[in-house]
Each structure stands twice: as C-alpha cells, then as structure tokens.
From Swiss-Prot:
Protein's recorded name: Isoleucine--tRNA ligase
Protein's UniProt keywords contain Metal-binding: yes
Gene3D superfamilies according to UniProt: 1.10.730.20, HUPs (3.40.50.620), Ile-tRNA synthetase CP2 domain-like (1.10.10.830), Valyl/Leucyl/Isoleucyl-tRNA synthetase, editing domain (3.90.740.10)
The species this protein was found in: Campylobacter jejuni (strain RM1221)
Domain notes: IleRS has two distinct active sites: one for aminoacylation and one for editing. The misactivated valine is translocated from the active site to the editing site, which sterically excludes the correctly activated isoleucine. The single editing site contains two valyl binding pockets, one specific for each substrate (Val-AMP or Val-tRNA(Ile)).
Example GO biological process: isoleucyl-tRNA aminoacylation
Length: 917
C-alpha cells in the first residue's frame, strides 16, 4: 500500500519561488489603476479618530531617480502605511521642486549658444518643459517601485497656483517686517553667476596661499606711536582681495607689540612669527590694541589708506593677529567696517573677474589696469604676490576646507551685492526674533534620532540672515515694485493681492511678460510710469520651505492636517529643507510646520564609499527591481539601521534575498498546513501550541512596538529570529507528525492548525505595511479563516492585539532540548543514528504529557522500558536517558512504534480505519 496517499500533506497555491521581478509590475499596475490603492486607504479610514500626515520633501524634477530617492520614498511610504494599519487616516501627497539652478543648467546645456537669443519667457518655457518631462519620468519610476501615494494629484512648485502661493508666503513675511534688501557679502557662485544660500554650499579641500604682508603705517600714525617707522603685518589666504582692502582689524582685548624691525604683531602670536622667520622677536614697544584704533596704514598695491579698526572676530589661533579686511568680500569684515562707516568696495563682477571698479576707485596703478580688468580673480593670485615685492614677508601653500557651489562644483567667493534677506534678529514676532522663535519651536519638535535637535539647533543659533534672492531666470520672482525716483521698494497689500491673482491665472511668467500697467489694479493709487520691477528670483529653498503653506494650508490639495505629523529626509536637510521650512513656518505662523522630524543616512557601496559612475559602483533602483525584485529593495532598507549610512551591493542584496525567502517559506508552510481548516474552535490547545502562541504573543508585541517607533531593523530582527529559531526551527518541525499523520479532525492536529492560522493571520497583519506585495499575494491563497473579509492587503489592520500568552515558562524545556541535541550531534557524528526517530527518551518525571514530550524531542516515544542507553544528560536535577528504540519503523509515520515493519503503528491503524470508512 502507498501510505503517502493517506497522509495529510501540506497543499497551497502560494508559490515557493516569488518570481518578484516578473510578477510585481502586474500587481503594482492594479494598485495604480485609477489610484486604487491610495483611494482605498483613504476610504477605509474616513471615520478614523486619528490622522497622520507626512509632508513630502520635493526632489528636483531633474534626472532619473537613484537609490537614495528609493530609500527616501520607500521609508516614507512604509511609515505612512504603518500608521494606516494602526487604524489612522493617512495622507501622502508627493511633490517636485521644479524651479532652480539644476534645471536651468540642464536647459542651458541643451540650448547652447541659442540661449543668448532667447527671451526670459522662452528660457522659462524650456525650463518648464524640462521639469514636466522629468516629473513624468520620476513619477513612473517611483510607481515601478510600488510606492503608494497620491500620484494623480502631486504638487509641483511650478504650477500657477503654487507659484502664487509661494509669492503670498513671501508677502506675509514682508508684512511681518522680516524682509529687507541690502548690500552685503554673500556666498557667490561665479560659475553660476548667482548668490547662494548656506544650504547650497558644500565644503571640499582646496589649495590656497597663506601670506603675510607688510602695510606701512603713515607718518601721523608713527608719530602717535612714538616710533620712526612701523608696519602692520596682515595675514590672508585670499591675495586677490587685497586690492579691495579698506581696513586692518585687531582684537580689542589683546596686546600688540612693535618689534625692533618695526613690525606689528599680536603679543600672543609673536612666538609663532619668530618661528616663521618674520622677526627676531625683540620687542620695541607693547601696547593695547585700542591704542592703534583709527590709525592709518598704506596698501602696498595701490597706495590707498587702510584704517586700523577693532574686531571681536580676530582670533589668536593663527596668523599675525592683524586681519586684512575687505568689507565686500567677507561677512565679518563687512560688519566690522559697518561700525566705522567704511565704504564697501566690490571690484569683482558676477563671473568672478575684476571689473572697471579697479579704475574708478584707483585700486591698482593705471599701467596695470589693462592686464587685470577682465582677469579671473583665481588667476590673479600669483600676479598679486609679484606686485607686493618686498612687502610680501612670507608665502606658502596649504590645504584647507573651502566652500564650493553644490551644483557647479566650483569654489565660491564672498561678494557684496544687493540682495534680499529674511532677518533673523529683528524682534518682529510679538517682541521676539525669528531666531528665538525658531529655537523655541525646535524644542517642541520630536526628532528621530534625538540628536537631530542639537544639530539643527546649533545651525539656527549661528546662521546669518537668510539670503533668499537669486540672479537667475528659472524661479518664482521676488515680484515687488520700486519707486523709479527714490528706488524705495513698495510693500502694499493691494499690489500683493493683485500680483498673486495674476500669478494664479497666468503663472509667474507674467512678471516678465506683462507690462507694469497690467500688473497693478486699474484704479491703483500708484502710477505705472513711476514704477519699476524687481527682477531677482527666489532661492529654491524658499520655494520648498514654503510648500507646507501651499500644500497643507491652501485647500488646493487633499493632503491632510494643516501641520504635518512628520518631515522625513536625509540628514543633510538639517541645513536645508528642515531649516528653511522651520524659518518660513515660524515667520508666518510662529510655529514649526512639523510635529516631528526623522532623518536617514546616505547610500554607499559595500565598502562604505560614495557611489559614482566613474567608480562603477552605482546600483540603480531599476536594476534592483529587475534583478531581485522591489520587495528585496524594501527589505534591504527595513533590515538596515537607516539612521546611519546604508551599504548596498549585489552581495548584500543576495543576503537580503535569503532573509526574504525565510519569511516567504514560513508563510507558505503556514498557509499550506491550514488549507483544510474549517473553523478556529479548539477545546484546549496542546502544551506545544500554548508554547508557540505565548512566544508569538511576546515577539509580535515587541515587533509591533518597534515598527510603531519606526525601529524597523529592530522589529525585523525580533521577527526573523522568532521565525527561524522558534517557529521554523522548533515548532513547525515538531508539528509535522500530527499535521501529516493524525486524522483530519484529530484534536492534536486541529490544535496545531488553529495555532498556525492565528499566527499566520497576525504575521500577515504585521508585515502588511512593510512587505505589502507579498502579503497581498499571500492573501489570495490564504484560508478564509486567516484573511477574513479582507479582499486585499489594504483591508488588514493592526488595531487588535494578538494576546495568547498562556504564561508558559519554557526555561526547563529549552535547556533540555539544547542538551538533547548536543548528544544527538555526537551520536550522528559517530554514525550510531541517522534520525532522532530511532530513539526513545527515558525520563523519571511527569511534568508534561508524554506524547507532547516525544514531539518536543522528535523521538519515537517517551518510554520507561529497559532499553539500550546511548547517552544521558541532566537538567535541574531531572535525568534524561536517550535509548535505542526497540520497536519497528511504522511504514506510514516512520516512528519506531510498530510490531513489525509491514504493520502500521496503533495511531496510524486507527487513522487508516477512519479513511476506509
């Protein structure tokens, strides 16, 4: 007889091989047809008591998505779904940053020389087309990753109503008195020909000169000091700025010496000056810094006067203690000179070349002007050193960290230009400054990780006023009018509202297309002929920083609460979007636009190196999806400590694939063995079932808590350990005998099936937010007792607690099992046995039912017969004897419980009788 036909073997249509790369797109297509998945999530939670709004930080609509984009969006969507399955109403409106330099540069490359013949309107139209193209491309790429969001109604910062909303936000800040225009040194990208905000600057190593230059004091200064001659020795790393020198700064709290050679240094730095060979160190006089105040020295390049001033910014950690001061080329220089009413000189044009200011202000001798005007400043350094002659006391080169433009990757300069600023230190917010209010709001914000509050807090504490103007074409205009005669900017509610309404209807392009008379009301008190336009555009960080107002507060989008529950981006956004949003939100609402901030690290290769095409270590999301499947990409993120940098490689993805297979195969086994279960009624669970349900209760609860705290790696670690060690490693293995060999309705079998069904149901609930595709697929093959009324994954819920804790203390049994298998390993190694079914176990206690103990140790039976002892061990003073089973192997269940090898054991005989009946 073929006894295999009599066994209740597992059966399921849920495939062992996931075939993710081929099958995922089909399921994703269903999710996105008519926005099915997102709309269903909204509908299912329309009466929810709680809500969760994640406001999407907009990526640039430029280029294809990379693995960092995938990390960011998948993490966002997972958190959204975590709250959804908690029973909360959720909103996730994706967006794109459509303005700015990255897009404009790409368009410039496409247009080439043609750009010079185009109007601003035409250039902006090309930019708009470029952004639109990549919005569509990126949207499809995100959807190919199965990311669920309101893709049919995204926000785009270039939409007409959005540009109007950005402009209205700017006007609100102006009305608060926090906006001003002034000439001030700002980071300037000569390569991009535009001002930059702090967030648009990155630091790289750069080689520069370190020079010490003598500026001779004039006769009056020497007389006042009582010396025949003296020279201040200034230190600088930017020789090209010496032509614009207006002052020399000393620290007012330090003493300065005049050496025997007539050189002036800070007393605290004299020793280092001796070491450099600049002086013998013999002191002629020592004076307090303030005795030098307002004396004048002579610039050796042009003979112009340079005033000695006091500056708290002068440090004693290097240099000479006397700082070359060019107020047009440094923020500290600017503020120090401002106190003395010293003129700001700016002899450098927007492309980084010396201009006619050299001639107009006499900054170089006339015979040198032809050589220097039009010369790029970085090419002028060597020429400047040569011109200094004997006044150049010391010159060397060194490597230091220097600011670079984040887009052109060229070094930037400080350049004084007229720009628009949001003021950090004006007490305009109920007597408080924007800086003070922003810091207060940070203390009310939850950070993941908590260290984030210190990081952004120190940045807010030390940041300068925010330069929000740019001298480019593609952006939202700072659409203000000036009086033609007085050049005063006009802040007027009537004009603000009228321009905003035009932008809403025609877009911000109208600022360039329309004449002034068409941009003001017909009955306006202002005469169009007396007005002129401001043509600067807004920093894109202002665009993105005001998205909360346009998306959450405008009513234009079904995007959730007016204050976002969470902002989630890479850790670099402490100085970027998190901060710009904080400043805009606090400025207009005196409140941060978010309740919490979560940051993630960056993606690197297996060795922790940054990915680049030149290194050949780039792994694109599309490659992962087509090679391994999106589910593997998701699991890679969720198994990683995303707060730190995440390493990715084929090797790592293969390891993640192994973990996925463990999860999938466990689900498959559970489904296959509950396929014929008719109900969940059981008189009493067996001890082993109580044990696994108790273990599952603890693990599921801990994993759920970890997921709810966004600690996905911790949650999965607990879960995978349970699936491998407890569920698959012990329980499923020891349950096979009763599942396969007991009668269909046997109490022991049903107890196991019900336990497995309960575990399967909760496991699918728990994985729904993380591995939605796999859970959705599993539900199609699950017993109705597991899936209930769920038509798909979006009908599942984590609102019910899994509570089957029977208070089982398994310490004794786990210790006994461990020691038992230590002995089994020895017996197998010595080739005494091949299987534990060849054994019986002899015990002297009756704490547990013998039948269940036999299953626990996977032996044929618990026996007190006098049999051959193969091994012994002891646990808590209880003795265990491993004996050689004396009966024959049952041809059906393979346990050694039969009288002869042809006859089934008593249990199997009973089952067979039932089948024959």
């Amino acid at each position: 007889m073929d006894y295999k036909e009599t066994l209740l073997l597992p059966s399921t249509s849920f495939a062992m091989r996931a075939n993710l790369a081929e099958l995922e797109p089909q399921r994703f297509k269903k999710w996105f047809e008519q926005n099915y998945a997102y709309e269903k999530m909204k509908e299912n939670r329309k009466n929810a008591k709680k809500s969760f709004t994640l406001h999407d930080g907009p990526p640039y609509a430029n280029g294809h998505i990379h693995i960092g984009h995938a990390l960011n969006k998948i993490l966002k969507e997972t958190i959204i779904k975590t709250h959804y399955f908690k029973g909360e109403s959720v909103r996730f409106t994706p967006g794109w940053d459509c303005h700015g330099l990255p897009i404009e540069q790409q368009v410039e490359v496409k247009l080439g020389e043609k750009k010079k013949s185009l109007s601003k309107k035409e250039i902006r139209e090309f930019c708009r087309q470029h952004a639109s193209e990549f919005v569509d491309i990126q949207r499809e790429e995100f959807k190919n990753l199965g990311i669920i969001a309101d893709w049919d109604k995204p926000y785009l910062t270039m939409k007409f109503e959005f540009e109007a909303a950005i402009y209205r936000t700017l006007c609100e800040i102006a009305k608060k008195g926090l906006l001003c225009e002034r000439s001030k040194p700002v980071f300037w990208s000569w390569a991009a020909k535009s001002a930059l905000a702090e967030a648009e600057v990155e630091y790289q190593d750069k080689e520069d000169y370190s020079i010490f230059v003598a500026f001779d004091l004039d006769v009056k200064a020497c007389e006042k000091l009582g010396v025949s001659k003296a020279s201040t020795v200034i230190w600088t790393t930017t020789p090209w700025t010496l032509v614009a020198n207006q002052a020399i700064a000393l620290n007012p709290n330090e003493n300065y010496v005049i050496t025997k050679e007539g050189l002036i240094f800070a007393s605290a730095l004299l020793k280092s000056m001796v070491e450099k060979g600049l002086t013998s160190g013999e002191i002629q006089k020592e004076l307090n810094a303030k005795e030098f105040e307002k004396l004048e020295a002579i610039n050796p390049l042009n003979g112009r006067k340079s005033v000695l001033i006091m500056g708290e910014h002068v440090l004693m950690d290097g240099g000479s203690g006397l700082v070359h001061t060019a107020p047009g080329h440094g923020e500290d220089d600017y503020y120090a000179c401002l106190k003395y009413g010293i003129e700001v000189l700016m002899p450098v044009d927007d492309s980084g070349c010396y201009d006619e200011t050299l001639r107009a202000k006499g900054l170089l001798p006339s015979h040198l002007l032809e050589e220097f005007i039009g010369l790029h400043i970085f090419k002028a350094n060597e020429k400047i050193l040569e011109l200094l002659g004997e006044k150049l006391l010391h010159s060397s080169k060194f490597i230091h960290s220097y600011p670079f433009c984040w887009r052109t990757h060229k070094p930037v300069i400080y350049r004084a230009t007229k720009q628009w600023f949001i003021l950090m230190d004006e007490p305009k917010l109920q007597g408080k400054t924007l800086r003070e209010c922003a810091k207060e709001q940070l203390l009310k914000t939850t950070f993941y990780p908590q260290s984030g509050v210190k990081r952004i807090g120190s940045m807010v504490e030390n940041r300068p006023d925010w330069c929000i103007s740019r001298q480019r074409d593609w952006g939202t205009p700072i659409a203000f009018f000036r009086d033609k005669n007085t050049k005063e900017v006009i802040f007027d509610d009537e004009l603000f509202d009228f321009v905003a309404a035009i932008f809403e209807k025609h877009g911000a392009d109208a600022w360039w297309e329309f004449e002034i008379k068409d941009l003001i009301p017909t009955n306006s008190k202002y005469n169009a002929e007396n007005l002129e336009k401001v043509y600067d555009i807004l920093d894109v960080w202002f665009d993105s920083g005001s998205t909360f107002n346009a998306v959450l507060n405008s009513g234009l989008y079904d995007a959730g609460e007016k204050r976002a529950s969470m902002y989630l981006e890479g850790s670099d956004q402490h100085r970027g979007w998190f901060q710009s949003s904080l400043l805009v939100g606090t400025a207009i609402n005196e409140s941060a636009p978010y309740e919490s901030i979560l940051t993630h690290g960056f993606t690197t290769d297996e060795k922790g190196q940054k990915m680049s095409k030149s290194k050949g270590n780039v792994i694109a999301p599309e490659y992962v999806a087509k090679t391994y499947g999106v589910e593997i990409l998701r699991l890679w993120i969720l198994l990683s400590d995303y707060l730190s940098d995440l390493k990715i490689s084929d090797n790592i993805l293969k390891q993640v694939g192994e973990q996925y297979r463990k999860i999938r195969n466990t689900i498959r086994f559970l489904l296959a063995n509950t396929n014929d279960l008719k109900d969940l009624e059981v008189k009493e669970f067996s001890f082993i079932d109580k044990w696994i349900l108790s273990r599952a209760t603890k693990v599921f609860k801990a994993s759920k808590e970890a997921f709810f705290a966004y600690e996905f790696a911790k949650g999965f670690s607990l879960l995978l350990n349970f699936l491998s060690a407890d569920l698959s490693g012990i329980y499923l293995d020891i349950s096979k005998d009763r599942l396969y060999c007991d009668s269909e309705n046997a109490q022991r079998r049903k107890s196991a099936q019900v336990a497995m069904a309960l575990i399967a149901k909760e496991l699918l609930n728990l994985l729904a937010s993380n591995l939605s595709y796999s859970v959705d697929e599993a539900l199609e093959h699950a017993n109705v007792l597991i899936k209930g009324d769920a038509k798909d994954v979006f009908d599942l819920s984590l609102t019910q607690d899994f509570d089957y804790d029977f208070g089982i203390d398994d310490t004794f049994l786990m210790s006994a099992r461990e020691k038992f298998f230590e002995q089994i390993d020895i017996l197998k190694k010595d080739k005494i046995i091949k299987s534990t079914l060849e054994l019986n176990l002899n015990i002297s206690f009756n704490k547990f039912p013998n039948e269940e103990l036999a299953d626990w140790f996977m032996v044929s039976q618990i026996s007190n017969e006098n049999e051959e002892i193969l091994a012994e061990f002891e646990v808590e003073n209880e003795k265990f004897k491993i004996t050689k089973a004396s009966l024959c192997k049952c041809p059906r269940c393979w346990k050694l419980q039969s009288k002869d090898e042809e006859t089934p054991c008593l249990r199997c005989e009973e089952v067979l009788k039932g089948i024959q009946c």
